[in-house]
Amino acid sequence: MPSFDVVSKIDLAELDNAVNQTKKELSTRYDFQGTHADVVLAPDNTAITVKANSEDRVQAAKEVLLTKLAKRNISLFALEYGDIEKTGLHNVKQVIKLQQGIPVEKSKELVKLLKDSKMKVQGSIQADQLRVTGKNRDDLQAAIALFRKEQDRLKLDMQFINFRD
């Protein structure tokens, strides 16, 4: 029976490159001189911390980071923004969590979307991914088209892998 998997993964090499490019740009741009602006990727690749000496500099550094991520084809749907918080007398930071895998509640939404569309496919939740099976290839391609159409509404980064006939 034909099937494919829906996953949400970030290319960690591209993520590291984007963070390094952001660091380089922050160190060379004139408007960031003396602001102690920095972008740090957590050692376990689960979060990015943006630091500076004021909220508007954190926002500006975050915009630079988002631009670099978008240029490297990393979906911005895979980011969860934390609150901007003070870390000392003159420092501010924001933690951006990286979403790897599809959360269970989003998987349930995707399965419900398949059932509501009345397509002849079934979705099964497997840990942090979703497997979609159907009787023929055309149904699976229609399911992929449906997921791509609803991707903005669901605010979920999705890739389709392991397409088997």
Swiss-Prot record:
Q: Which UniProt keywords apply?
A: Nucleotide-binding
Keyword field contains Amino-acid biosynthesis: no
CDD domains found in the cross-reference section: YajQ_like
Question: What GO molecular function annotations does the UniProt record carry, in alphabetical order?
Answer: nucleotide binding
Keyword Nucleotide-binding tagged = yes
InterPro entries (alphabetical): DUF520 (IPR007551), UPF0234-like_C (IPR035571), UPF0234_N (IPR035570), YajQ-like_sf (IPR036183)
- Spell out the GO cellular component terms annotated for this protein, sorted alphabetically and separated by semicolons: cytosol
**Matches recorded under HAMAP family:** YajQ (MF_00632)
Function noted in UniProt: Nucleotide-binding protein.
Report the family membership: Belongs to the YajQ family.
* Protein's UniProt name: Nucleotide-binding protein MXAN_1478
Provenance organism = Myxococcus xanthus (strain DK1622)
